[in-house]
Curated annotation (Swiss-Prot):
The keyword Transmembrane helix applies. This is Transmembrane protein C16orf54. GO terms for cellular component: membrane. The chain crosses the membrane at residues 32-52. It is found in: Membrane. The modification Phosphothreonine is found at residues 112, 116. It comes from Homo sapiens (Human). It is a single-pass membrane protein. Glycans are attached at residue 4. PANTHER family: TRANSMEMBRANE PROTEIN C16ORF54. The modification Phosphoserine is found at residue 194. Keywords: Glycoprotein, Membrane, Phosphoprotein, Transmembrane, Transmembrane helix. It comes from the Eukaryota.
Length: 224
């Protein structure tokens, strides 16, 4: 029977485990260009921020004369006022944001008539002042025509003399002048104690008409 060599007695030290299984090599070839691009972008952003901050601080140290702070002035009486800056025209343009100056040295031109051709054709002509020859009789007085009412209509009992026993809901109107044609509304006048004018639209009835109405209705009193 052949003899086999026995292992030596005692602990045998071998190589460590990390040396037995070495790390695989990483492919770092594409990483280098990517990191260079990121570093370039970061440097560009940092440079832009520094330039903008430098310009901002320089402008803050040298303020614009057109946008200076308002001047405070003490007026008599212990009042603190803000002194206006610039001229009145500049202030108006800055306030309203208008490109056209709002304060002009000449009178504004009359607005031109704007509209369609049909509207201008159907529009009534503008009234022209009549060229009357001067007369030596003195200034002529213009007769004032009373205001016309839309809902006015001639009543059958208007125009006759007031009879006894009339019950009127309004005071009798004044007689129209001779120049006013018959059938035109009478001039309105102020009601005593009231700011509203009296238009003369209230109906006027007589006692006989009221009695005839109730007789026709077959009643002598109103019941609820």
């Amino acid at each position: 029977m052949p003899l086999t060599p026995e292992p030596p007695s005692g602990r045998v030290e071998g190589p460590p485990a990390w040396e037995a299984a070495p790390w695989p090599s990483l492919p770092c070839g594409p990483c280098i260009p990517i990191m260079l691009v990121l570093a370039t972008l970061a440097a560009l952003f940092i440079l832009t921020t520094a330039v903008l901050a430098e310009r901002l601080f320089r402008r803050a140290l040298r303020p614009d004369p057109s946008h200076r702070a308002p001047t405070l002035v003490w007026r008599p009486g212990g009042e603190l006022w803000i002194e206006p800056m610039g001229t009145a025209r500049e202030r108006s343009e800055d306030w309203y944001g208008s490109a056209v100056p709002l304060l002009t040295d000449r009178a504004p031109e009359p607005p031109t008539q704007v509209g369609t051709l049909e509207a201008r054709a159907t529009a009534p002509p503008a009234p022209s002042a009549p060229n009357s020859a001067p007369s030596n009789l003195g200034p002529q007085t213009v007769l004032e025509v009373p205001a016309r009412s839309t809902f006015w209509g001639p009543q059958p009992w208007e125009g006759r003399p007031p009879a006894t026993g009339l019950v009127s809901w309004a005071e009798p109107e004044q007689r129209p002048e001779a120049s006013v044609q018959f059938g035109s509304p009478q001039a309105r006048r102020q009601r005593p104690g009231s700011p509203d004018p009296e238009w003369g639209l209230q109906p006027r009835v007589t006692l006989e008409q009221i009695s005839a109405f109730w007789k026709r209705e077959g009643r002598t009193s109103v019941g609820f």
